[in-house]
Amino acid sequence: MAKVSMRDMLQAGVHFGHQTRFWNPKMKPFIFGARNNVHIINLEKTVPMFDDALNYLSSVASKKGKILFVGTKRAATEAVKEAAANCEQFYVNHRWLGGMLTNWKTVRQSIKRLKDLEAQSLDGTFEKLTKKEALMRTREMEKLEKSLGGIKDMGGLPDVLFVIDADHEHIAIKEANNLGIPVVSIVDTNSNPDGVDYIIPGNDDAIRAVQLYLNAAADSIKTARELDIVVQAEQDGFVEAN
């Protein structure tokens, strides 16, 4: 499993919170103090809490669970997509559509439409259409890909959400809470930690910090999945030997 040291976190700026006037008092237990009117996060709390979160993500991955990475603000967009691809999981990195989890039935229909359009674009159907109609379908496909591309192969609700900014993604967290889906989230000093099962107190704005969280999560998930494949193969081999 990926190990992230306090030094790694300091170098990535994980300890820098938001301006003190924007703080959420519920984050007080995780704040070390303030410097130049900016809250400083207590990394002695963050390191073990991040380890717990990574252990949990690993255990979900080892049971073939589906992990949904959520990060729709600009600092996270590309990194979220890369991390999810790296560990063969799922992601939402543009606008969170209300009902993405709680109205899965409708989302599933949109995913089906996206896959139909993708098939049409490959099998020559678009070429038989008028230019205008082909353009309309291409635009529809691109729009659906942007919002649903990261979950089109999820095949049902996720087993856990890994969220980059609890404040920015509060709708996603609320939907997960309503469905009893566990939430692992980076929670900055301006955010409400309620509804987050595995709180990771940390900077949710600095790109280096965001990449640190995502890389560690992706590595942990990947390792757990690979370990599960090895164990499975050994068990299968053991069964065959009898």
Curated annotation (Swiss-Prot):
The keyword S-adenosyl-L-methionine does not apply. PROSITE patterns: RIBOSOMAL_S2_1, RIBOSOMAL_S2_2. Coiled coil: none annotated. Transmembrane segments: none annotated. One of its GO terms (cellular component) is cytosolic small ribosomal subunit. GO terms for biological process: translation. It comes from the Bacteria. It holds the Pfam family Ribosomal_S2. One of its GO terms (molecular function) is structural constituent of ribosome. Keywords: Ribonucleoprotein, Ribosomal protein. Belongs to the universal ribosomal protein uS2 family. PANTHER family: 30S RIBOSOMAL PROTEIN S2 PROKARYOTIC AND ORGANELLAR, SMALL RIBOSOMAL SUBUNIT PROTEIN US2M. NCBIfam families: rpsB_bact (TIGR01011). This is Small ribosomal subunit protein uS2. It comes from Tolumonas auensis (strain DSM 9187 / NBRC 110442 / TA 4). The gene is rpsB.
